[in-house]
């Protein structure tokens, strides 16, 4: 059910399982990336998701406030208690995607709560490459929003053959936040919303 992280028992269960075998390689690596003297803190990946067994990698911009440890859940999760996660959970449910199908991530995985700059996107490229190495079953990359797309294009400059070599299907759409629909043109708003639904349907079709 959407926003399950608002439930303390659900959140506690996710915390207790954060080093379950399917997510341990990712979350142990996340532990290594946390550095108060470097780029700072980043959230774990919730064990609700597929971890290294996931077939789809979802990339957003950067971790939002609902991921913060102590304030939010401490996890990247489509069950976080915020509108963006709620929309993603709904879109997944509409097309038959399960949480285990997905590995959630960000173009810049450290918490900044603002648009990443060029240096940060470059750092994010290295993180995405390492994540793909950890998750060999990923077949689809879902880029949600302009920053996710920009980060992927920077990745392709370094590794132009990765899509072909890994057999990746790359799907682009708008960010699942409310702000992504901000426009005075009602037709454009509806087109953006429709594209988000289409993109999730494309992910589901690619995984069949």
Which residues make up each language-model segment?
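A polyanion-binding, active-site-adjacent surface
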Residues: 2-159, 168-174, 178-181
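Short, surface-exposed amphipathic charged segments that create phosphate/polyanion-binding patches used
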Residues: 119-122, 182-194
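A polyampholytic, Gly/Pro-enriched intrinsically disordered region
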Residues: 187-208
């Amino acid at each position: 059910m959407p926003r399950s992280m608002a439930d303390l028992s659900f959140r506690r269960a996710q915390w207790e399982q954060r080093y379950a075998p399917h997510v341990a390689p990712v979350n142990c690596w996340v532990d290594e990336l946390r550095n108060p003297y470097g780029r700072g803190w980043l959230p774990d990946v919730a064990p609700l998701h597929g971890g290294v067994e996931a077939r789809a990698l979802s990339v957003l911009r950067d971790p939002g406030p609902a991921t913060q440890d102590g304030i939010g859940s401490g996890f990247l999760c489509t069950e976080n208690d915020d509108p963006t996660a709620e929309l993603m959970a709904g879109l997944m449910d509409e097309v038959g995607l399960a949480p285990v199908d997905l590995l959630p991530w960000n173009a810049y995985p450290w918490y900044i709560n603002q648009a990443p700059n060029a240096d940060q996107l470059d750092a994010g490229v290295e993180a995405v490459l390492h994540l793909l190495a950890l998750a060999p079953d990923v077949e689809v990359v879902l880029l949600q929003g302009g920053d996710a797309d920009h980060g992927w294009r920077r990745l392709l400059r370094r590794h132009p053959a990765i899509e072909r070599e890994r057999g990746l299907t790359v799907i682009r759409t708008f960010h699942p936040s409310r702000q992504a629909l901000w426009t005075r043109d009602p037709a454009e708003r509806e087109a953006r919303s429709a594209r988000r639904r289409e993109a999730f349907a494309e992910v589901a079709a690619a995984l069949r």
